[in-house]
Amino acid sequence: MATGPRYKVPMRRRREVRTDYHQRLRLLKSGKPRLVARKSNKHVTAQLVTTGPDGDETVASAHSSDLDAYGWAAPTGNLPAAYLTGLLAGQRAVDAGVEEAVLDIGLNTATPGSKVFAIQEGAIDAGLDVPHNDSVLADWSRTRGEHIAEYAESLDEPLYSGDFDATALPAHFDETREAIMED
């Protein structure tokens, strides 16, 4: 570690590799609420956050574990679950009076077709106005989980056994999406 009078210690969240302050400042200058999309291996989270002088305030949020209330029985860390989480967060934001937002992907890499863009697509379908480029959104077949169902069909039965039959994922996705849209 560098020493001396000219050495400047980075901010704590920068040292922990949790915040890109240059990106955060650009998002805050827009003056719009942020659609914060975060992912882990098992879950995804979507939040609508406004910034004020007293700090950030969460207006609406959804976690992929919230999908259980709408009948989602599949794993919660995949692309279809990310879309449904964005759809749910978008509906909650519209109910709270938010009309537009900008996407905040944090330190996630902006890979086209990824889960953070599936969250964005779900929020757009819920009625939020989020500026985007259609080339980063996944094909609808991938968003529905057809690629997961095809892979599950190619596996041998002893290798593939679980609580949820992934070959029925696209139909299950459609049912859950309708349940969220009706709510």
Swiss-Prot record:
Keyword Ribosomal protein: yes
Lineage, opening ranks: Archaea, Methanobacteriati, Methanobacteriota, Stenosarchaea group, Halobacteria
Protein name per Swiss-Prot or TrEMBL: Large ribosomal subunit protein uL18
Superkingdom classification of source: Archaea
Species assigned in the record: Halobacterium salinarum (strain ATCC 700922 / JCM 11081 / NRC-1) (Halobacterium halobium)
Any GO molecular function: 5S rRNA binding
Gene (name only): rpl18
Gene Ontology cellular-component annotations: cytosolic large ribosomal subunit
NCBIfam families registered for this protein in UniProt: PRK08569.1
Cystine bridges: none
Family: Belongs to the universal ribosomal protein uL18 family.
GO terms, biological process: ribosomal large subunit assembly; translation
Entries under InterPro entries matching the protein: Rbsml_uL18_euk
Annotated Gene3D superfamilies: 3.30.420.100
